[in-house]
Amino acid sequence: MQTLAERVGSLHGESLEQRYRTRGPAYFSRLLRGTHVLSSDELVRLVERAEEQGTLSDAEAQEIYDADLVVRGRRRPDGAPLYLVVEVSVGVGTHDVERAVRRAVLLTRTGVTALPVVAGNWVTPEATEAARAYQVWQLTDGRVIAPSADTSQG
């Protein structure tokens, strides 16, 4: 049975995920032009083609479906189509970074270009290092941090 603190934490996480989903264009426009958060149906159509072609297994497809958000748009510098695989957590940890990377790699097997992104209110120092090592973009309170950014300077 969940404690009250666990329930509140779970609700806070769901609320944050919903905020990124509904305000996707505002948050992700710093990375992409023409941002669009994919609906479940749109994601299924994208992934099922790869599954039918044998590019993804059922388990790998499910892993992509478990992503918190998938966002489509055009890369700012050159307009190339790009997808973001976003893991949202109130407090982003290394597991969130690893999930974003794993799911972005799988999504590329559908034939699209995808980048991993983590988003939340705060990021642990270990997750910041992992994001830098794995080239994962970070969004904290709407602020975009590139994988190569030096966040050690305050």
Task: Pin down the residues of each PLM region.
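Active-site metal-binding core of divalent-cation-utilizing nuclease and nuclease-like domains
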Residues: 36-79
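Domain-level recognition of nuclease-like catalytic cores that cleave nucleotide substrates
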Residues: 109, 117-154
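N-terminal capping/linker segments that flank leucine-rich repeat
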Residues: 35-45, 137-138, 151-154
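Arginine/glycine-rich "motif VI" loop of SF2 helicases in the C-terminal RecA-like domain
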Residues: 105-113
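A structural signal for isolated positions on well-ordered beta-strands in alpha/beta enzyme cores
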Residues: 84, 115-117
